[in-house]
């Protein structure tokens, strides 16, 4: 009996491993706006859903790093659902306080941008499997706002 149960567990584990899963990628990270206390950037995330039913997104966790330091992090609870058999674009707003940008003055230099690494964890609720996290990481450069951006 025990042997039969082990075979059943292995069969289910193999089928779950080979199931198609949603895939995601960061398509863009851009300046969005300036407020009195922070600069807001917007990360665009493309997520494809291979299933014929919508899948709820539980949360999005993010961490923005520059010069080896975490400059922003947070969680976006319940950002919606993935469209059935389609690609969904998600907007992830990231707020960076002005005080932290000032501490990155060495990295900013003459080109008025910062090198960044954006780490995202997209937590989705897959039927049968349960919560599943899609880890994403993107490196690049973000332009800092100019005076004209602040008064536009």
UniProtKB/Swiss-Prot annotation:
One Gene Ontology term from the biological process aspect of the record: response to desiccation
InterPro entries: Lea14-like, LEA_2, WHy-dom
Pfam family, one: LEA_2
Homology family: Belongs to the LEA type 2 family.
Name of the protein this chain belongs to: Desiccation protectant protein Lea14 homolog
Taxonomic source organism: Glycine max
Lineage, uppermost ranks: Eukaryota, Viridiplantae, Streptophyta, Embryophyta, Tracheophyta
């Amino acid at each position: 009996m025990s042997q039969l149960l082990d075979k059943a567990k292995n069969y289910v584990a193999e089928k779950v491993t080979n199931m198609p899963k949603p895939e995601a990628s960061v398509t863009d990270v851009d300046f969005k706006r300036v407020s009195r206390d922070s600069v807001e950037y917007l990360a665009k995330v493309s997520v494809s859903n291979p299933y014929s039913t919508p899948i709820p997104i539980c949360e999005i966790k993010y961490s923005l790093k520059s010069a080896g330091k975490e400059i922003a992090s947070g969680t976006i609870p319940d950002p919606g659902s993935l469209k059935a058999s389609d690609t969904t674009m998600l907007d992830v707003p990231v707020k960076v306080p002005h005080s932290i940008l000032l501490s990155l003055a060495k990295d900013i230099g003459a080109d008025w941008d910062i090198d960044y690494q954006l780490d995202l964890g997209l937590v989705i609720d897959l039927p049968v499997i349960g919560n599943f996290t899609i880890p994403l990481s993107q490196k690049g450069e973000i332009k800092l706002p100019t005076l004209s951006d602040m008064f536009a």
